[in-house]
């Protein structure tokens, strides 16, 4: 299940060495990778060094695309083909190390704004869509021509939504077309009126309309995962969509449709269980999963305030890629919260190889903030920026004297009554002075020290003062297969 965060470690060992072959025929490169638009982007900026970020599955075309762009723009192209948490986020750090003045991101993207103001453009690598088959599938799933429906798609199929809507509008009166929410260029003005942005998409809602009034028709399907429940783009849509509205998906190649109601129910049940685990937890580990997405520092501070307000202890862990072996070194942590981009925030299933569950920031918000979710909002947002002040979905913590904190709460897992959180001042460092001793020593009680003393193994024993002091002597010389003090036989 760790593959949810990045490519499995075994993939590097199983991959055959050598230059990968060309995946896209040369005549189709311009169309698939939108090279004319990309070349115009580079020329308009006047960049001399540009970073081209490719996912693993598209590296076979990287050399041909870079050569074509160098020929048409005269700029130097650098290929970025390795990222720590998959390739959906813009690798700003890698681009800066190459001295690039702009980044061109190819392939699936979470469309999260980068943490640093570097010019970025996205190429979603268009996937062919059988429009006639999709029209028949839409008509079969939506017999009522007056029902409000939103057209959604995976990023690679977004180019075909307007054409699909053109074929459907003569019959369907209330049709809304979504579009990818590309980050606005630095210094540009927001359009007026500003469309609603949710799930990495923009929705041009009419005045007085709400997204919760619409059903959904999704065109696309993940080719990377054999389990559709682990498709992060579709999963975040199913989790955040209004539970009472229909949601169906359609394969862009065959037109095969599926009602996603049952899958959405399974996903919501799984996430509600994780929220209950977070409410029962006393120690929370905050995993820093991204440094290249905007507002990650503010989100980390927000999560720490949440845990403190709920009477929980939190630890910030920067471990690189989360793996079961790394997280097993922290048995005192009850749950982990992964601070990552919207696609990486969906944690793997609890039945996987991780010893403790891994949550999304929204699930910690639901567990620690008694005022969450706001009325009329589906209780799951995958982007941590939606939880911060300034977002229309931000819900401030109730004051300490609010009755919301005193509401009786029973754990649905253990059946025990949860005590209300004990409020502490911000100057409290987690230890409580008990009694001053006559020798002017101070006895303290620390939860961390109490847990350490109860562990059967507490680490390497220093044994200070119990081992004799010896003089330094010469060690072995040579290499492991032939030390000088060993025979040559």
UniProtKB/Swiss-Prot annotation:
Modified residues (Phosphoserine): 7, 446, 456, 488
Gene Ontology MF annotations: 2-(3-amino-3-carboxypropyl)histidine synthase activity; 4 iron, 4 sulfur cluster binding; metal ion binding
Functional pathway: Protein modification; peptidyl-diphthamide biosynthesis
One Pfam entry name: Diphthamide_syn
One Gene Ontology CC term in the entry: 2-(3-amino-3-carboxypropyl)histidine synthase complex
Modified positions (N-acetylmethionine) in chain numbering: 1
Cofactor binding notes: Binds 1 [4Fe-4S] cluster per subunit. The cluster facilitates the reduction of the catalytic iron-sulfur cluster in the DPH1 subunit.
Tree of life domain: Eukaryota
KW Iron (keyword) present: yes
Modified residues (Phosphothreonine): 435, 467
Residues binding [4Fe-4S] cluster, per UniProt: 89, 110, 341
Keyword vocabulary terms for this entry: Acetylation, Iron, Iron-sulfur, Metal-binding, Phosphoprotein
Subunit text: Component of the 2-(3-amino-3-carboxypropyl)histidine synthase complex composed of DPH1, DPH2, DPH3 and a NADH-dependent reductase. Interacts with DPH1.
Family recorded in the similarity comment: Belongs to the DPH1/DPH2 family. DPH2 subfamily.
Protein name per its UniProtKB record: 2-(3-amino-3-carboxypropyl)histidine synthase subunit 2
């Amino acid at each position: 299940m760790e593959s949810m965060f990045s490519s499995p470690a075994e993939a590097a060992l199983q991959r055959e060495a050598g230059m990968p072959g060309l995946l896209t025929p040369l005549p189709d490169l311009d169309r698939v990778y939108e090279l004319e638009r990309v070349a115009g982007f580079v020329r308009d900026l006047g960049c001399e060094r540009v970073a081209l970020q490719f996912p693993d599955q598209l590296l076979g075309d990287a050399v041909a695309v870079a050569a074509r762009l160098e020929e048409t723009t005269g700029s130097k192209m650098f290929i970025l083909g390795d990222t720590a948490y998959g390739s959906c986020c813009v690798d700003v750090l890698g681009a800066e190390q190459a001295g690039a003045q702009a980044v061109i991101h190819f392939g699936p993207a979470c469309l999260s704004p980068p943490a640093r103001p570097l010019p970025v453009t996205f190429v979603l690598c268009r996937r062919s869509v059988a429009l006639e088959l999709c029209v028949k599938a839409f008509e079969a799933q939506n017999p009522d021509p007056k029902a409000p429906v939103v057209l959604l798609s995976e990023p690679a199929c977004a180019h075909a939504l307007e054409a699909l809507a053109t074929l459907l509008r003569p019959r369907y009166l209330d049709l809304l077309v979504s579009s990818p929410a590309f980050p606005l260029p630095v210094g540009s003005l927001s359009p007026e009126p500003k469309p609603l942005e949710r799930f990495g998409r923009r929705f041009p809602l009419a005045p007085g309309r709400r997204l919760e009034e619409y059903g959904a028709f999704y065109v696309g399907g993940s080719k990377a995962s054999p389990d559709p429940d682990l498709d992060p783009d579709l999963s975040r849509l199913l989790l955040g969509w209004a539970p009472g509205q229909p949601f169906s998906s359609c394969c862009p190649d065959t037109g095969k449709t599926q009602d996603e109601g049952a899958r959405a129910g399974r996903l919501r049940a799984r996430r509600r269980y994780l929220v209950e685990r977070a409410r029962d937890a006393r120690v929370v580990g905050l995993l820093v999963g991204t440094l290249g997405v905007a507002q990650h520092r503010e989100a980390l501070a927000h999560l720490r305030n949440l845990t403190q307000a709920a009477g929980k202890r939190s630890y910030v862990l920067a471990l690189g890629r989360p793996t079961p072996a790394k997280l097993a070194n922290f048995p005192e942590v009850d749950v982990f919260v992964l601070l990552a981009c919207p696609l990486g925030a969906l944690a793997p299933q609890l039945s996987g190889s991780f010893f403790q569950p891994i949550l999304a920031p929204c699930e910690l918000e639901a567990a620690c903030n008694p005022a969450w979710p706001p009325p009329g909002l589906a209780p799951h947002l995958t982007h941590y920026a939606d939880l911060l002040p300034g977002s229309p979905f931000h819900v401030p913590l109730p004051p300490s004297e609010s009755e919301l904190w005193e509401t009786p709460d029973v754990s649905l897992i253990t059946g025990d009554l949860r005590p209300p959180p004990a409020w502490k001042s911000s100057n409290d460092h987690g230890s409580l002075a008990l009694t001053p001793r006559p020798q002017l020593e101070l006895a303290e009680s620390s939860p961390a020290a109490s847990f350490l003393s109860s562990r059967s193994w507490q680490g390497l024993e220093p044994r200070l003062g119990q081992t004799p002091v010896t003089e330094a002597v010469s060690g072995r010389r040579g290499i492991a297969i032939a030390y000088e003090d060993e025979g040559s036989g």
